[in-house]
């Protein structure tokens, strides 16, 4: 739950038993788990929240297959459109590393509007991604290619998208 006192906000969560990072699960991640990520992110954004640092340590799956979006310390309680777009780009890049660009785009397409998808393309650049995600991309030697593949797929899906970095 979340509570406010004066100018402070307190967020209390459950301990997640058997949590495994979405990145560690890789191909084991099913479409339901991907859909849970996008659904949780949309609910947070609708409530005015932005996460700010979506990486492998903040997206975990418990023993029952339930996805948890953790580590909201870098988040915003009165988020801007830009910070919400950053969240979307971070989530898309993270899921692409875990399950591949095609499945990541398919999952995002099931939950996001065409306008939201189009807004992600220019945000897909290394500087927008959390350090941990950039490091994983670098270790795989895939940094620029993964981001370019995602931008290309978004432009193909939403031809009005501007894929040039913002």
Residue ranges of predicted features:
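Conserved kinase catalytic-core helix
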Residues: 22-57, 67
